[in-house]
Structures are given as structure tokens and as C-alpha cells.
């Protein structure tokens, strides 16, 4: 969330699932805790608690069934509307001077197309990720022309480049996701939908 806010994002939707109620509480105002901290003179902690609840406009939607990242992204359709939007995988923490999602938003502004963060992974690990077919354009910019989610054989590996837990997508992805058949593990894979527009 802090990365998104640092990138200038003010409206944030967090897709959760069963057992994640504490996450919602974390970003909520906590008058009882604030009162306790104020009475005990812990002003530094009080300020931190107040800042957390005021970081951004944060909403939550529950993904009732674990049907994959594509299914989770599809849950955001009514929140997003027809605007481009950022996707930040919940299990990926990326640090840097310029937030990773800010860099992608800037590149989206330059190219006007969907943008994904890319990382190079070890050959022995590529089967755990999506493999991207890329063409180097300039500096650290690549054009992605194809992708394969979790390649199972060496022939399916397009390269050792994979998605780096961040992307900026156009709203057109929702219609594609609605028509994407479940893939690996019976899940709706975001990469399968993104492949349609690569």
C-alpha cells in the first residue's frame, strides 16, 4: 500500500480471501487504540496509527473462491470501470528509490499500452513463474510478444524473463478475463488473458 501511495495512487482496492480480516482492520481507524496511545503519551505510535488509516481511499473485496490471479483481478472490474489500473501482487515486496509501480505507470504514460515489470529468473525456477517472450527495445525496456504461465517442459519456456509482481493494465483485460478458460490448476490465469493482448 505504501508503494502505491508513493506512486501517487489514491484509490486502492485490496482483494482478500478467507482469514484476512485483520488486513482490513489494519487500515481502519482505531479510536480505542488511538485513545490508549494518547493517554500513555506514545505520540510517535499514535501518529503512525493515524497515518495508516489515512494513507489512501482503501476498499476491500473478498475473493470467495481461490480461482487464480485472473479471477481476483476480475473482481476489481466495477471498482476500476474503464480506467487503466495497477496490479500489485500481494506476495511481492519490491524496494527502490522510485517505487516499481511508479516506474510502470510512467512507462504506461509513455507507451499507452499495458506494462509489466520483468525479472530474470534461474532456469531451474522458471517452471514456478510465467515465461515471457521479449524483444529488447532500449535501456531496460522490452516488448513482450507472448507469455506462458508456469511452463512445464523446456520447449514451453519462451525465455528466462518473468513478470515481476507488478503491472499496469487497460480495462479491456476484464472482457478477456471473462472469456478466459481455466488453465493450470483449474485457475483463471492473468497471464493467459494478458497473452491475448501481448
Residue ranges and their predicted role:
Residues 86, 105-109, 136-198:
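Catalytic-core segments of class I nucleotidyltransferases/pyrophosphorylases
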Residues 14-15, 61, 165:
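Small/polar loops that bind or transfer phosphate-bearing groups
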Residues 18, 92, 99, 171-172:
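Alpha-helix/helix-capping structural signal
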Amino acid at each position: 500500500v505504501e508503494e502505491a501511495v508513493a506512486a501517487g495512487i489514491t484509490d486502492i482496492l485490496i482483494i482478500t480471501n478467507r482469514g484476512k480480516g485483520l488486513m482490513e482492520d489494519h487500515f481502519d481507524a482505531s479510536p480505542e487504540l488511538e485513545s490508549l496511545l494518547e493517554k500513555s503519551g506514545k505520540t510517535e505510535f499514535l501518529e503512525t496509527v493515524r497515518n495508516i488509516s489515512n494513507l489512501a481511499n482503501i476498499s476491500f473485496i473478498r475473493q470467495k473462491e481461490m480461482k487464480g490471479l485472473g479471477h481476483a483481478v476480475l473482481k476489481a472490474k466495477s471498482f476500476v470501470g474503464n480506467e487503466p489500473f495497477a496490479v500489485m501482487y500481494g506476495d511481492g515486496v519490491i524496494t527502490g528509490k522510485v517505487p516499481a509501480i511508479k516506474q510502470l505507470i510512467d512507462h504506461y504514460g509513455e507507451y499507452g499500452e499495458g506494462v509489466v515489470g520483468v525479472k530474470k529468473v534461474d532456469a531451474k525456477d522458471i517452471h514456478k513463474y510465467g515465461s515471457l517472450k521479449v524483444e529488447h527495445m532500449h535501456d531496460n525496456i522490452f516488448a513482450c510478444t507472448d507469455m506462458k504461465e508456469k511452463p512445464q517442459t523446456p520447449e514451453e519456456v519462451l525465455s528466462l524473463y518473468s513478470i515481476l509482481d507488478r503491472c499496469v493494465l487497460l480495462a479491456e483485460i476484464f472482457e478477456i478475463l471473462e472469456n478466459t478458460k481455466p488453465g493450470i490448476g483449474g485457475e483463471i490465469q492473468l497471464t493467459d488473458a494478458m497473452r491475448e493482448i501481448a
